[in-house]
UniProtKB/Swiss-Prot annotation:
Principal location listed in the UniProt entry: plastid
Family from the record: Belongs to the PsaA/PsaB family.
UniProt entry tagged with the keyword Metal-binding: yes
Keywords assigned by UniProt, alphabetized: 4Fe-4S, Chlorophyll, Chloroplast, Chromophore, Electron transport, Iron, Iron-sulfur, Magnesium, Membrane, Metal-binding, Oxidoreductase, Photosynthesis, Photosystem I, Plastid, Thylakoid, Transmembrane, Transmembrane helix, Transport
Any GO CC annotation of this UniProt entry: photosystem I
Name of the molecule in the record: Photosystem I P700 chlorophyll a apoprotein A1
Record-level GO BP terms: photosynthesis
Matches recorded under SUPFAM superfamilies: Photosystem I subunits PsaA/PsaB
Cofactor binding remark: P700 is a chlorophyll a/chlorophyll a' dimer, A0 is one or more chlorophyll a, A1 is one or both phylloquinones and FX is a shared 4Fe-4S iron-sulfur center.
Length: 752
């Protein structure tokens, strides 16, 4: 039944804590495995160390109390924040002490960013390359210099101050993590009070966060950047606080500042249009978004989130109730709708985490695509190594988060799902027609795989036979991505109707001019053709297979026709016991394991597509006469339509820089390229191995030790099947990521 507003109001929100619930004891923590009765007894076999790592953060296995688990997670979040602040502080400190930031600031197009100087011990100083301006160091590709410029940082002193601030925040977070677990730990109802949490996160985190950044941009960044853009040297600029306290200073740059806040309260908001703009496009001096546009954007978001932060009903009997919304959410084909989902999301943190990981992972991938289409910071678009690094980084982060969503969805199904509380709701109905979902998804994967790969096989065959007129290409049988081209066209034409005062389209990827900074291309229209159409369908194929594996793992994690009692076997198990062959790799854990390989496939092709497409069709230079020349001279359209083209003109041709890097400042990438290949190959030893083989080997080695009376007291054991797979997939991905990283950076630092 729905609770009325009056009844809701009687349930007052209170912040309740338990005082001193858990003693602070270094003696206890010093004991390995203190969280588990079995592990605390110490090692009998080498399996103990594996179980120690597997269970240390599996709070469900430490206690069955949801309140205690919630407190541990809450406390761990503060620890995570402390690490992030410490890392950030280190980045800012390096910028202050070891970088050429000030030199870069005065000439960002000719000088490359560096914030790491390798000390000479046994000749590593070869890695300190000449980055311009007489500075020797390792070129960095993190984008920190560009974000510092956008923040209005112009001196090393400001970087030091921020680094100290980061250290202070890290200490504060560590203290908070200890305090809220050992001294004043919130009660379970505080963690389950979703309306209050939504209000505070929306209004506080997002609303005030956006407002703070908008305020900083308006008062500090925009005036400083305007002066830098007009050629004022960083040394001549006033200190940032001058812009805050001296209104005259800013009024010279933005006249509306002289009017103060009167236009705001008299609703003449148009007065502020000199620093809150709606220009669209990119600043031609920096190749980044107009900072006055981004300030406007964050101010608008702040208003939006501050309003949204008053949306949910807490102590005042007004606003939405999450439970009511979910239970009212019924459709003609959805039975009980979302009845029971509220209870799931307030009692299963795995279910909550699965949704959050899927959302944040997708958001990270969206960020990757916006970072190059609408470069947010000054001079980031012309720093090709940074652009490539940030795209790759956000794609990887997104992929891991999405696979993590599949993992925690399966853990929820095994550990937290209660069939009795979920009768005929959407979740139950999805699980009941899972066969239809999985078989259809499987059909889609087979269709996409055969057709997309078939187009490539056809092209390779025709090219081998010398029948180029029979190939799918822009010059023979065209497969133009007409829908994508239509969307591009709409987006390039739309601003003239929807925002007539805008100077340009939102992104030059859709159409418009070539934006070049110092004759180096920042962004330009990205033409799509047959090659993009073909690669796109490979993307569709690999993504659908990844989804198939993860969704099948989640939907069949409790039971299947093959193993009806899967839920009693747990989240990870090797098979259904002796005497049941053919039941390997069916656990929820194994689906995550398999999903990781396909996630790797998907993302490799996506980042390869991006890297080659940008070098071929976007990145390059413009001559004074206006002739555009690209790094690889537009070879994508004709080469990316065959498998041989990908192998020869992308992988092999662009690997020359990393392979020939020895003896140069890029030699570290050559070594990483080699070493990461070895790490990847090492993974195969675990992925193709049989456990019995190793156990036999171990036993003969133990016999030899006994013979010479040096037998170990801890009995050696071969890795379990699951442990072997975990080591295998970890090295497979680490090796693959390391190889790609070295390949990309050696290439783009050389030619970019």
């Amino acid at each position: 039944m729905t609770i009325s507003s009056q009844e809701q109001e009687t349930k007052k929100v209170q912040v309740t804590v338990d005082k001193n619930p858990v003693a602070t004891s270094f003696e206890k923590w010093a004991k390995p495995g203190h969280f588990s009765r079995t592990l605390a007894k110490g090692p009998k076999t080498t399996t103990w160390i594996w179980n120690l790592h597997a269970d240390a953060h599996d709070f469900d296995s430490h206690t069955s109390s949801l309140e205690e688990v919630s407190r541990k997670i809450f406390s761990a979040h503060f620890g995570q924040l402390a690490i992030i602040f410490l890392w950030l502080s280190g980045m800012y400190f390096h910028g202050a002490k070891f970088s050429n930031y000030i030199a870069w600031l005065s000439n960002p197009t000719a000088i490359k960013p560096s914030a790491q100087i390798v000390w000479p011990i046994v000749g590593q100083e070869i890695l300190n390359g000449d980055v311009g301006g007489g500075f020797q160091g390792v070129q960095i590709t993190s984008g920190f210099f560009q974000i510092w410029r956008a923040s209005g940082i112009t001196t090393e002193f400001e970087l030091y101050a921020t680094a100290i601030g980061g250290l202070f925040m890290a200490c504060l977070m560590l203290f908070a993590g200890w305090f809220h677990y050992h001294k004043a730990a919130p009660k379970l109802e505080w963690f389950q009070n979703v309306e209050s949490m939504m209000n505070h996160h929306l209004a506080g985190l997002l609303g005030l966060g956006c407002l703070g950044w908008a305020g900083h941009q308006i008062h500090i960044s925009i005036p400083i950047n305007k002066l830098l853009d007009s050629g004022v040297s960083p040394q001549e600029l006033p200190l940032p606080h001058e812009f805050l306290v001296n209104r005259e200073l800013v009024s010279q740059l933005y006249p509306s500042f002289s009017k103060g806040i009167i236009p705001f309260f008299t609703l003449n908001w148009n007065e502020y249009s000199d620093f809150l703009t709606f220009k669209g496009g990119l600043n031609p001096i920096t190749g980044g978004l107009w900072l006055t546009d981004t300030a406007h954007h964050h101010l608008a978001l702040a208003v939006l989130f501050l309003v949204a932060g008053h949306m949910y009903r807490t102590n005042w009997g007004i606003g939405h109730s999450m439970k009511e919304i979910l239970e009212a959410h019924k459709g003609p084909f959805t039975g009980e709708g979302h009845k029971g989902i509220y209870e799931i999301l307030t009692t299963s943190w795995h279910a909550q985490l699965a949704i959050n990981l899927a959302m944040m992972g997708s958001l990270s991938i969206i960020v990757a695509h916006h970072m190059y289409a609408m470069p947010p910071y000054p001079y980031i678009a012309t720093d090709y190594p940074t652009q490539l690094s940030l795209f790759t980084h956000h794609m990887w982060i997104g992929g891991f988060c999405i696979v993590g969503a599949g993992a925690h969805a399966s853990i929820f199904m095994v550990r937290d799902y209660n069939p009795a509380q979920n009768y005929n709701n959407v979740l139950d109905r999805v699980i009941r027609h899972r066969d239809a979902i999985i078989s259809h998804l499987n059909w889609v994967c087979i269709f996409l795989g055969f057709h997309s790969f078939g187009l490539y096989i056809h092209n390779d065959t025709m090219r081998a036979l010398g029948r180029s007129q029979d190939m799918f290409s822009d010059t023979a049988i065209q497969l133009q991505p007409i829908f994508a081209q239509w969307i591009q066209n709409i987006h390039s034409l739309a601003p003239s109707n929807t925002s007539p005062n805008a100077l340009a389209t939102a992104s030059y990827a859709f159409g418009g001019d070539v934006i070049a900074v110092n004759n180096k291309i920042a962004m330009m229209p990205i033409n799509l053709g047959t090659a993009d159409f073909m690669v796109h369908h490979i993307h569709a194929f690999t993504i659908h297979v990844t989804v198939l594996i993860l969704v099948k793992g989640f939907l069949f994690s409790r039971n299947s026709r093959l193993i009806p009692d899967k839920s009693s076997l747990g989240f990870r198990f090797p098979c259904d016991g002796p005497g049941r062959g053919g039941t390997c790799q069916v656990s929820g854990w194994d689906h995550v394991f398999l999903g990781l390989f396909w996630m790797y496939n998907s993302l490799s092709i996506a980042i390869f597509h991006f890297s080659w497409k940008m070098q071929s069709d976007v990145w390059g230079s413009v001559t004074p006469a206006g002739t555009v020349s690209h790094i690889t001279g537009g070879n994508f359209a004709q080469s990316a339509i065959t498998i041989n083209g990908w192998l020869r003109d992308f992988l092999w041709a662009q690997a020359s820089q990393v392979i020939q890097s020895y003896g140069s400042a890029l030699s570290a990438y050559g070594l990483i390229f080699l070493g990461a290949h070895f790490v990847w190959a090492f993974s195969l030893m675990f992925l193709f191995s049989g456990r019995g083989y190793w156990q036999e080997l171990i036993e003969s080695i133990v016999w030899a030790h006994n013979k010479v009376k040096v037998a170990p007291s801890i009995q050696p054991r071969a890795l379990s099947i699951t442990q072997g797979r975990a080591v295998g997939v970890a090295h497979y991905l680490l090796g693959g990521i390391g190889t790609t990283w070295a390949f990309f950076l050696a290439r783009i630092i050389s030619v970019g």
